[in-house]
């Protein structure tokens, strides 16, 4: 399956909105999270796995029926989401990724970090 950066972002936003101290997020076949409705169950589960492998989320408990329980975003996940939360920053990040011809999560995280760094630098000029 191809990595869909928009799906990753929507998953991270959904996890942030639905977790907290002592509160995990359950993702099941019939889940009704607004941002995830446009993706198939398999697509979301694949991208949850990619988020876990990339250390963006913590403690994913997987069950035999394909559902899972997610504890929270990791510190790295919070940082990445902070960098891409703004639609403007996200669209710029995706545009640069497309221009350079990459869709890897590592590259997208690096591009997002640089987009933010350039915005900060511009404030000092």
Where are these regions (language model features)?
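Short amphipathic alpha-helical interface segments
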Residues: 2-34
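Short, amphipathic alpha-helical interaction segments positioned at domain boundaries
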Residues: 69-97
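Generic structural signal for hydrophobic core residues of well-folded globular domains
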Residues: 15-18, 51, 81-84
């Amino acid at each position: 399956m191809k990595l869909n950066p928009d799906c990753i972002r929507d998953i991270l936003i959904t996890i942030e909105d639905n977790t907290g101290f002592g509160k995990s997020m359950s993702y099941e076949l019939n889940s009704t999270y607004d941002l995830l409705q446009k993706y198939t169950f398999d697509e979301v589960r694949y991208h949850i796995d990619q988020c876990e492998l990339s250390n963006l989320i913590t403690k994913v408990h997987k069950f035999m029926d394909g559902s899972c329980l997610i504890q929270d975003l990791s510190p790295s996940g919070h940082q990445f989401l902070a960098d891409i939360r703004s639609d403007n920053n996200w669209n710029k990040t995706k545009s640069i990724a497309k221009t350079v011809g990459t869709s890897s999560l590592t590259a997208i995280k690096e591009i997002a970090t640089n987009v933010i760094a350039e915005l900060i630098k511009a404030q000092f000029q």
